Amino acid sequence: MRKKILVVEDDPELVELISFNLRASGFAVGTAADGIDALKKARSILPDLILLDLMLPGLDGFAVCEILRRDAATARIPIVMVTAMSSQFARLTGMEAGATDYITKPFSPKHLVARVQELVAQPATLQPTSSAIS
């Protein structure tokens, strides 16, 4: 089964570039253009990884990340922030919000895909679990 990646980005050209490269590498790709849609789609498709822009309409990426981390269904999905915000403060804020990794724009599509492949290949400790406590 192909791994599912949710791309949360409001720039249509960048969404197309990222989606094309991920699909070419064998991933299934879903997209969202704002924070509210990102939350809905993350909860409905339960992706294996989320690529999350920070500067989004509605809820920003920091808020989206924090909400996803508080939701048991999405708390363990790796989240990679992909943003033009390159300051140390933004990186720290992103990691404190629960990001797994932080990639700044502009980026190499090959580097982005390689990072996604690495993260989705990691053990299930970062992945959502559906086991019930007995």
How should each PLM-predicted stretch be described?
Residues F107-Q117:
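C-terminal output helix
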Residues D53, T83:
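Active-site residues of response regulator receiver
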Residues E9:
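Conserved acidic carboxylate
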Residues T31-L49:
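Acidic, metal-coordinating helix/loop segments flanking the phosphotransfer/catalytic sites
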Residues V15, P57, A75, S87, ...:
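The feature encodes the CheY-like receiver
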Residues E13-A24:
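Charged docking surfaces used in two-component/phosphorelay signaling
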